[in-house]
């Protein structure tokens, strides 16, 4: 098995059609499409299933990566869609559209590094939730900080996509980011 990129700039040079014969399955790391390296760009979804309204046509998202792998000859039943048990954040975000697609001035503090927090930490903050049905993405916004992360609902939508498209399953990064009651892992199992 391998953990493989979901961004076209990273999977583009790989001979996907040639390598899959040596692999039982491929874990597509379908997260980190946006993050702290874009501190002064738009607050955006870091693990969207479908194209974000903030993105231009050249952007990456989960379903686009799956399509690219299958078009390159990788059997769909060898692909696992990755979901994050952490979120990416932006600070200095205007209070418009619950922060989505708004220009940021930086990245907020995180437990390990700026702009990244575990689901457990973000869920415990109790901020107002927002949902983007088109991208199957969850986020929170407190008036100046925007955090994009998968929750039970987004994992359920991604599981529906996996089942509906014949993928092998879901994988996640990283178990310690889950809430103490294991709700994200339980959501994966029940999906």
Regions picked out by a protein language model, each given a short descriptive name:
Residues 29-31, 47, 84, 137-139, ...:
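Flexible, active-site-adjacent loop/turn segments at secondary-structure boundaries
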Residues 109-166:
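Hydrophobic, secondary-structure "cap" segments at the distal end of domains
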